[in-house]
């Protein structure tokens, strides 16, 4: 049975999520599987009884939300198929970008008797384009950038260039593969007589098994599988008992493993952990 869709929106609403998954882990896993569709501004998850098993993912572009909805509809996520549709109203962060945001005093509205509510106030609360999602909670997540109400690029640290998806990943809407987004650092230009930066030492020969290092403590098998199963030939992820920082990923052949390695090299699962990928020793 198809999930009914409302009009396209920057925000997608996801339900039928596994309620046993911790909030922090759920946010990181959602980011891992949806970041391939475009820039994510925020992910809203609440553990309240009313909002369990639900989440909202806010994209900068509507086209990103559309691609995510169509591609991930029914995707088995923690053993349950996701049900996805567009959110009915704009989130606050999108309303601010559009210039339609209206600040609301929720406490005052809550205290005001119904008899004193004017038609205009009812319309602002019920139909305002900037109405937030009821029950949505925004809070810092260990290992992820703080979720703010102002649009910004994920993983942007002071003194560093904005985060860019790794080569081979789907580029942000409106940009061709390899094109530099506005504000990103261009490739380094060498001056006459200047030596290029030292290249890393040669690594192990090609192998159909990849060796992953510098993984954060909260990394799990499902999270890595969602990152690598978008590449042809993916077979499985193997974690090492007693070691959270390393893992192995197996592909059908060396060429497919190399393509995944090149695409996800340096991918930041968390703000401070850029994944390092090499061919496993034979």
UniProtKB/Swiss-Prot annotation:
Q: Does the keyword Acetylation apply?
A: yes
Disordered as annotated region, ranges? 100-130
Modified sites of kind N-acetylalanine = 2
**Location of Omega-N-methylarginine modifications:** 152
Residues the record lists as N6-acetyllysine modifications? 60
Location (main, coarse): nucleus
Q: Where is the RRM domain?
A: 10-89, 208-282
What PROSITE patterns would the database entry show?
RRM
Q: Name one GO cellular component term.
A: spliceosomal complex
Name the InterPro entries for this protein.
Nucleotide-bd_a/b_plait_sf, RBD_domain_sf, RRM_dom, U1A_RRM1, U1A_RRM2
Kindly state a single biological-process term from the GO annotations of this entry: mRNA splicing, via spliceosome
**Which keywords, in A-to-Z order, does the entry hold?**
Acetylation, Methylation, mRNA processing, mRNA splicing, Nucleus, Repeat, Ribonucleoprotein, RNA-binding, Spliceosome
Q: Where in the cell is it found?
A: Nucleus
- Gene3D superfamilies, A to Z: 3.30.70.330
**MF (Gene Ontology):** RNA binding; U1 snRNA binding
Q: What does this protein do?
A: Component of the spliceosomal U1 snRNP, which is essential for recognition of the pre-mRNA 5' splice-site and the subsequent assembly of the spliceosome. U1 snRNP is the first snRNP to interact with pre-mRNA. This interaction is required for the subsequent binding of U2 snRNP and the U4/U6/U5 tri-snRNP. SNRPA binds stem loop II of U1 snRNA. In a snRNP-free form (SF-A) may be involved in coupled pre-mRNA splicing and polyadenylation process. May bind preferentially to the 5'-UGCAC-3' motif on RNAs.
Q: Hey, which family's this protein in?
A: Belongs to the RRM U1 A/B'' family.
- PANTHER family to which the protein is assigned, alphabetical: U1 SMALL NUCLEAR RIBONUCLEOPROTEIN A/U2 SMALL NUCLEAR RIBONUCLEOPROTEIN B
Listed under subunit, the entry gives: U1 snRNP is composed of the 7 core Sm proteins SNRPB, SNRPD1, SNRPD2, SNRPD3, SNRPE, SNRPF and SNRPG that assemble in a heptameric protein ring on the Sm site of the small nuclear RNA to form the core snRNP, and at least three U1 snRNP-specific proteins SNRNP70/U1-70K, SNRPA/U1-A and SNRPC/U1-C. Interacts with SFPQ; component of a snRNP-free complex with SFPQ.
* Name under which the protein is recorded: U1 small nuclear ribonucleoprotein A
Task: Provide the gene name from the record.
Answer: SNRPA
């Amino acid at each position: 049975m198809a999930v009914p869709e409302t009009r396209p929106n920057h925000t997608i609403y996801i339900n039928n999520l596994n309620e046993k998954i911790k909030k922090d882990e759920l946010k990181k896993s959602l980011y891992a599987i949806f970041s391939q569709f475009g820039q994510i501004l925020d992910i809203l998850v609440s553990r309240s009884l009313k909002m369990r098993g639900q989440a909202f993912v806010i994209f900068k572009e509507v086209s990103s939300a559309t691609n995510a909805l169509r591609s991930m509809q029914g995707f088995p996520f923690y053993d349950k198929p996701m049900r996805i549709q567009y959110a009915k109203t704009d989130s606050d962060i999108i309303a601010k970008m559009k210039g339609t945001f209206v600040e609301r005093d929720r406490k005052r509205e809550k205290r005001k008797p119904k008899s004193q509510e004017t038609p205009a106030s009812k319309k602002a609360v019920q139909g305002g384009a900037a109405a937030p999602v009821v029950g949505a909670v925004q809070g810092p997540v260990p290992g992820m950038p703080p979720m703010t109400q102002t649009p910004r690029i994920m993983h942007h640290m002071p003194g560093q260039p904005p985060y860019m998806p790794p080569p081979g990943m789907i580029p942000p809407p409106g940009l061709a593969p390899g094109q530099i987004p506005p504000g990103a650092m261009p490739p380094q230009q060498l001056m006459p007589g200047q030596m290029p930066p030292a290249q890393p030492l040669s690594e192990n020969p090609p192998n159909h098994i990849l060796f992953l290092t510098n993984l954060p403590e909260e990394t799990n098998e499902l999270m890595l599988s969602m990152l690598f199963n978008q590449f042809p030939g993916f077979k499985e992820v193997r974690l090492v008992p007693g070691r959270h920082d390393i893992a192995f990923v197996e592909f059908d052949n060396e060429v497919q493993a190399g393509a995944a390695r090149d695409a996800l090299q340096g991918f930041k699962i968390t703000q401070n952990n850029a994944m390092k990928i090499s061919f496993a020793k034979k």
